[in-house]
Curated annotation (Swiss-Prot):
One of the record's GO cellular component terms: extracellular region
Key words, A-Z: Antimicrobial, Disulfide bond, Fungicide, Secreted, Signal
UniProt source species: Cotesia flavipes (Parasitic wasp)
Record's comment describing the protein's domains: The presence of a 'disulfide through disulfide knot' structurally defines this protein as a knottin.
Tissue expression remark: Abundantly expressed by teratocytes, which are extra-embryonic cells released by parasitoid wasps into their hosts during larval eclosion.
Disulfide feature: 28-42, 35-46, 41-57
Protein name: Teratocyte protein CftICK-II
Subcellular location: Secreted
Additional detail: Negative results: does not influence host total hemocyte count. Does not influence hemocyte spread index in the host. Has no effect on humoral immune system, since it does not influence the activities of prophenoloxidase and phenoloxidase in the hemolymph of larval Diatraea saccharalis. Non-toxic to human cells, Gram-positive or -negative bacteria. In vivo, ingestion of this peptide does not impact larval mortality of the lepidopteran species S.frugiperda, a non- permissive host for C.flavipes.
């Protein structure tokens, strides 16, 4: 009983984290932004690896390149 409860909680956390990453990738592509090749912060944001924000990446030296 306890094991299944822990598994369910872990699975919900996994889904939540995965969803955050998907949202980040969607925002980036929806706005038409491409990551600068030498920009790790925005690169991770566009690829949905970290739940970061435009506010962080938009400040220098982080910049977006728009097609």
């Amino acid at each position: 009983m306890v094991k299944s409860l822990l598994f369910a909680i872990g699975y919900l956390i996994f889904l939540l984290v995965t969803r955050v990453n998907v949202i980040n990738a969607d925002i980036c592509s929806h706005l038409g932004y491409a990551c600068a090749d030498d920009n790790e912060c925005c690169d991770k944001f566009c690829k949905g690896l970290t739940p970061t924000t435009y506010g962080i990446c938009n400040k220098k030296p982080y910049t977006y390149r728009q097609y």
